[in-house]
């Protein structure tokens, strides 16, 4: 792999969630190992991750997915911190720093905010940081009920 590519890896809730403290640590470790290989071969990698609501439910002892939006948002707020910490701890063992990027639908709909998010991701990559992108479920409304949205278009070239 001589030519540099930008890889976008989507880690959905069913992969990220697990029995070990609400997170599938084995999956995240394997993912980190594969990303380490790519990075050592001059490849850029962005991780789009889900799992904050499931992690928060685990941390709060909630067994059944709540119907109330505010409770789902609270679970996301609690879980996102833990998900981010697990990614950082896992990648740190391999010598990498991760950066948490939380995106909402409003960020995508507003051109200025969209470009700011895209530029932040590009800056993280330029600094050698692995961006971990997740939907900001704490402020999400309807979309939290339907699951995570892919933000791969943030990584594509755009016209300013």
Give the location of each predicted region.
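N-terminal glycine-/serine-/threonine-rich phosphate-binding loop
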Residues: 1-46
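Short beta-strand segments at enzyme active-site cores
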Residues: 8-10, 44-56, 98-100, 132-134
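Short, active-site-adjacent cap segments at secondary-structure transitions
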Residues: 15-17, 52-56, 108-109, 138-140
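Short acidic, glycine/serine/threonine-rich loops at helix termini
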Residues: 19-21, 56-61, 111-115, 142-146
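Charged helix-capping and loop-helix junction motifs
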Residues: 25-29, 114-118, 146-151
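Glycine-rich loop at the start of a catalytic domain that most often binds anionic cofactors/ligands
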Residues: 52-69
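Ligand-binding beta-strand-loop-alpha-helix segment within the catalytic cores
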Residues: 65-140
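Conserved small/polar residues in nucleotide/adenosyl-binding loops
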Residues: 152-160
């Amino acid at each position: 792999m001589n030519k540099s590519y930008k890889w976008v890896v989507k880690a959905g809730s069913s992969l990220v969630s697990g029995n070990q403290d609400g997170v599938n640590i084995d999956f995240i470790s394997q993912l980190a190992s594969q990303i380490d290989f790519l990075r050592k071969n001059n490849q850029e990698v962005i991780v789009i991750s889900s799992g904050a609501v499931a992690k928060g439910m685990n941390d709060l002892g909630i067994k059944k997915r709540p119907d109330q939006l505010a409770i789902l948002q609270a679970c996301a707020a609690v879980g996102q911190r833990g998900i981010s910490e697990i990614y950082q701890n896992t990648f740190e063992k391999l010598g990498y720093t991760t950066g948490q990027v939380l995106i909402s639908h409003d960020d995508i709909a507003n051109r200025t905010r969209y470009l700011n998010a895209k530029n932040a991701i590009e800056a993280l990559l330029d600094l050698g940081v692995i961006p971990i992108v997740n939907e900001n479920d704490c402020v999400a409304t309807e979309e939290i009920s339907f699951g995570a949205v892919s933000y791969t278009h943030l990584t594509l070239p755009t016209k300013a």
